[in-house]
């Protein structure tokens, strides 16, 4: 132990202790007889202010505060996949077994990784090899989907003095020894890393490949790149959680980390019930084999909301360093900000806007800055990414409040949820007028190369139609649609088609829940062909009424495509497109 002090004051999750000379910021302290875990957030002389991550009921002045000399850290190694942890990375399933209670007992200590479970280790490095931070020295097939790569920790480099042969080992077994110029360092299957310190990498890259999610409005209208950042703000009942769950279920990421930060417990229960039954659309294996859940629900200690966000992003960086694309989903960062506000108030800090601490923007920036696509440290060379999608819950749907407005400064994709769309049963309720994505130009080349060379052009036409429809809506409200020209009436017709056939998506329909990029492009092609051909006929003097008499019957078929055509039956969409073109061609001949 690094020393101990005495508690002099208890104020909710904030404990003040004297006699803490030589303590460091963010050092872990165990408070009271129950040894409740806390973290030092302020030091004044030999007095430390400790943010305790468990309920402090019964802690009284005079009790001891034990310094540990270490920062709040997580265990990184085989056994994380498919696990459900609390905000301190304690495994909730094993805690339930040990305490025989539905609630987490205060002061309980259970390691994140199971100590007795044996893993089949295949070494890939040899004795005498020169190793440096990030080098892969062994592999473990953790699940059918994830090959866990054992990497040299960032602070270790030297000559591999010894490495264990292929066989079964626990995470505590020493599998290698590295000679660091006379100092021999033992390596186990797991390593520890402080959650507040970003893990190092070789080089940060520009994100150019889209993170495909199977949600059409996300992939096509407001795409996120691998290594990108996105925010989903929305008022109560607008569909934030279902949208985030859809991302977690269907996204192309190899590893998904879902952090439930201060949200309702039944939402995490939902995840645990659904994920084992669902199959990953990219591999056909159970989704839980690539998912890690961090549950810090609304009835758990407020202070641990902050640690749950950091625990999630540190685990994401670890899998990024192995060469995987990771998606971190956080629901919701507003609850974390509320925890910062409460603790700031208890520490008597000067409040800023709406009572939030003045350092809220810098904390949000630190968090989002840990996203990115990188070249990982070590050999062999590999690319990994951490993409972050976070919900924001502004009170009353006010996007000008501090958490939303500050988040907007740091994210490059904005998916605002509109309660009026949700009430109209339009899901996902992402407002296509307010939303934006800074990755459209970066990912366009991927779409052109792999899906459709006219993707950017078609998307631009769809977006222009939606923007023009928003302008026309005001005129229609005042004087009715009859006063509009045929060109503008066609805009209204096409925008209705875009909304019903493309933007709306049923997250609970077996076929519509996930749209492959090829299916998305083909549905977009149908709408694009409908609009551009009708527009040409209007230019040649035909009336919209005459055009719709001939081709209007195709509209219900275009809308039904998303429900009736599976991702491997796309030739049916081509057949419909050919029939549509034939109908337009016959109209063109009549005009001629």
Curated annotation (Swiss-Prot):
Any GO BP: proton motive force-driven plasma membrane ATP synthesis
Protein residues bound to ATP: 234-241
Reaction(s) catalysed by this chain's protein: ATP + H2O + 4 H(+)(in) = ADP + phosphate + 5 H(+)(out)
KW Transcription regulation (keyword) present: no
Uppermost EC category: translocase
SMART domains: AAA (SM00382)
Primary site of residence: membrane
Keywords: ATP synthesis, ATP-binding, Cell membrane, Hydrogen ion transport, Ion transport, Membrane, Nucleotide-binding, Translocase, Transport
Compartments, record wording: Cell membrane
One of the record's GO molecular function terms: proton-transporting ATPase activity, rotational mechanism
Cytoplasm recorded as keyword: no
Segments forming a coiled coil: none
Any GO CC annotation of this UniProt entry: proton-transporting two-sector ATPase complex, catalytic domain
Gene3D superfamilies referenced in this protein's UniProt entry, alphabetically: 2.40.30.20, 2.40.50.100, Bovine Mitochondrial F1-atpase, Atp Synthase Beta Chain, Chain D, domain 3, P-loop containing nucleotide triphosphate hydrolases
InterPro entries cross-referenced by the UniProt entry: AAA+_ATPase, ATP-synt_VA_C, ATP-synth_a_Xtn, ATP_synth_asu-like_sf, ATP_synth_asu_arc, ATPase_F1/V1/A1_a/bsu_N, ATPase_F1/V1/A1_a/bsu_N_sf, ATPase_F1/V1/A1_a/bsu_nucl-bd
Family (UniProt): Belongs to the ATPase alpha/beta chains family.
HAMAP family assigned to the protein according to its UniProt record, in alphabetical order: ATP_synth_A_arch
Subunit structure, interactors included: Has multiple subunits with at least A(3), B(3), C, D, E, F, H, I and proteolipid K(x).
PANTHER family reported in the protein's UniProt record: H(+)-TRANSPORTING TWO-SECTOR ATPASE, V-TYPE PROTON ATPASE CATALYTIC SUBUNIT A
Function, in words: Produces ATP from ADP in the presence of a proton gradient across the membrane. The archaeal alpha chain is a catalytic subunit.
Name under which the protein is recorded: A-type ATP synthase subunit A
Phylogenetic lineage: Archaea, Thermoproteota, Thermoprotei, Sulfolobales, Sulfolobaceae
């Amino acid at each position: 132990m690094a020393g101990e002090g005495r508690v002099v004051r208890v104020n909710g999750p904030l404990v003040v202790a004297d006699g803490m000379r030589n303590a460091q910021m963010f050092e872990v302290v165990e408070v009271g007889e129950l040894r409740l875990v806390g973290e030092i957030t302020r030091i004044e002389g030999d007095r430390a202010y400790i943010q305790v991550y468990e309920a402090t009921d019964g802690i009284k002045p005079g009790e001891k505060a034990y310094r540990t000399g270490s920062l709040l850290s997580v265990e990184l190694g085989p056994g994380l996949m498919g696990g459900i942890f609390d905000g301190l990375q304690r495994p909730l399933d094993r805690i339930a077994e040990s305490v025989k209670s539905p609630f987490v007992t205060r002061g309980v200590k259970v390691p994140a990784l199971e100590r007795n479970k044996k893993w089949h280790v295949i070494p890939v490095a040899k004795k005498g090899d020169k190793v440096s931070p990030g080098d892969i020295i062994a592999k473990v097939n953790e699940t059918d989907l994830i090959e866990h790569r054992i990497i040299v920790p960032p602070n270790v480099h030297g000559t591999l003095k010894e490495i264990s042969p292929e066989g079964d080992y626990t995470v505590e077994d020493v599998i290698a020894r590295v000679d660091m110029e006379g100092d021999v360092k033992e390596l186990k299957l797991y390593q520890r890393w402080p959650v507040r310190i970003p893990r190092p990498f070789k080089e940060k890259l520009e994100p150019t490949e889209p993170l495909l999610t199977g949600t059409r409005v996300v992939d096509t209208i407001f795409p996120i790149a691998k290594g990108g950042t996105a925010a989903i703000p929305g008022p109560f009942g607008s569909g934030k959680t279902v949208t985030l769950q859809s991302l977690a279920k269907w996204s192309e990421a190899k590893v998904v980390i879902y952090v439930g930060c201060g949200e309702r417990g039944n939402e995490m229960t939902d995840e645990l019930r659904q994920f084992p039954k669902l199959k990953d659309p990219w591999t056909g294996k159970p989704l839980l084999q690539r998912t890690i859940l961090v549950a810090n629900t609304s009835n758990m200690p407020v202070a641990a909301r902050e640690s749950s966000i950091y625990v999630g992003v540190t685990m994401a960086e670890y899998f990024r360093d192995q060469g995987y694309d990771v998606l971190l989903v956080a629901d919701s960062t507003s609850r974390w900000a509320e925890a910062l506000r409460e603790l700031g108030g208890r520490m008597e800090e000067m409040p800023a806007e709406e009572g939030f601490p003045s350092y809220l923007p810098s904390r949000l920036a630190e968090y989002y800055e840990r996203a990115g696509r990188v070249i990982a440290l070590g050999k062999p060379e590999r690319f990994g990414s951490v993409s972050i999608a976070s919900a924001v819950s502004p009170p009353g749907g006010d996007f000008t409040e501090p958490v939303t407005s500050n988040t907007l400064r740091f994210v490059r994709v904005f998916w605002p949820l509109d309660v009026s769309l949700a009430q109209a049963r339009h899901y996902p309720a992402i407002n296509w007028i307010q939303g934006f994505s800074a990755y459209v130009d970066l990912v366009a080349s991927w779409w052109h190369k792999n899906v459709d060379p006219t993707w950017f052009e078609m998307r631009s036409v769809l977006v222009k139609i939606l923007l023009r429809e928003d302008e026309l809506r005001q005129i229609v409200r005042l004087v009715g649609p009859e006063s509009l020209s045929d060109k503008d009436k066609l805009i209204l017709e096409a925008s209705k088609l875009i909304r019903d056939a493309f933007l709306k998506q049923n997250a609970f329909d077996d076929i519509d829940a996930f749209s492959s990029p090829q299916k998305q492009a083909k549905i977009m092609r149908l709408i694009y062909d409908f609009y551009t051909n009708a527009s040409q006929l209007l230019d040649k003097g035909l009336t919209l009424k005459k055009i719709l008499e001939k081709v209007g019957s195709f509209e219900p078929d275009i809308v039904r495509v998303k429900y009736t055509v599976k991702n491997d039956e796309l030739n049916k969409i081509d057949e419909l497109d050919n029939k549509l073109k034939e109908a337009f061609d016959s109209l063109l001949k009549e005009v001629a």
